[in-house]
Amino acid sequence: MPMISVLGKMFLWQREGPGGRWTCQTSRRVASDPAWAVEWIELPRGLSLSSLGSARTLRGWSRSPRPSSVDSQDLPEVNVGDTVAMLPKSRRALTIQEIAALARSSLHGISQVVKDHVTKPTAMAQGRVAHLIEWKGWSKPSDSPAALESAFSSYSDLSEGEQEARFAAGVAEQFAIAEAKLRAWSSVDGDDSTDDSYDEDFTGGIDTDMAGPLGSHLQDLFTGRRFSRPVRQGSVEPESDCSQTVSPDTLCSSLCSLEDGLLGSPARMTSQLLGEELLLARLPPSRESAFRSLGPLEAQDSLYNSPLSESCLSPAEEEPDSCKDCQLLCPLPTGSWERQQQVSDVASSGVVSLDEDEVDQ
């Protein structure tokens, strides 16, 4: 009968018949001692008892051919507290399968923690939305654990409609954050060049740079969105005196030449604008009011919504139809073609001289 001595106490193992189970019997001294309680400890399969003469374990005992009487002093002492020493050397090193199983269990535990921390199952899992994404910061919570627990459980107490509304609000907030980030990135990259920015620069340039020399009448034309490009500050040519009254054909020609010269240099455009102001100052009151009404009319016309390069022809193609758009408002009187061309050149330069006037007479 095998015997095991644990901390000096004798435990006798006895098998109940061939193929039966093994039972542990203690001595009367151990059983009568209240400080001792027998606990069933399952030893690993590879543990061998050298005192029995053959390798036997608690799970697979084999009946010895002849009983052997073994003294209790010769039995080895087993330290129950040291679990590593109880394992055999072949089982102390973990195999790759056991490491993989440990990694899988650890990953499963981590994923479960993340799922409990980030997402919460809702009542919308029936084919619509499986989880409500509620981001919770991983930093140290400032609230008490009871408050956090109530915040987690508050969603499940809501009705289905309130849950859907809360989810829709969260999705809308995420879309707003994403759109704000995209706009910030595009503004950093310089892609956010809209018409509003041009309009702001345009009006700002008029108020600061061009308000003094241009006057209020041309500012009305600018604010009427007649020109689709911002005006840059250019060199202002000195004004010259004009003592002659300008005819309607000169006004129409100057308007067309002014529109054609927008693509030119800033100095040429500024001189044309100054010439228009001089012409406006010399007009009678009736014609001056008609000239002021050109800005709103041209702003409403769809022709001026197209780029200036499309509405203005080349100098070779411009001469036959130079004042086609202005003939409805200002009919041209009968006269020679040379005089019209000369007046157009005078208006495009923005200066009316006395020598050219004498030639016209």
UniProtKB/Swiss-Prot annotation:
Residues 341-351 have a biased composition (Polar residues). Residues 341-361 are annotated as: Disordered. InterPro entries: FAM131. Belongs to the FAM131 family. PANTHER family: PROTEIN FAM131A, PROTEIN FAM131B-RELATED. This is Protein FAM131A. It comes from Mus musculus (Mouse). The gene is Fam131a.
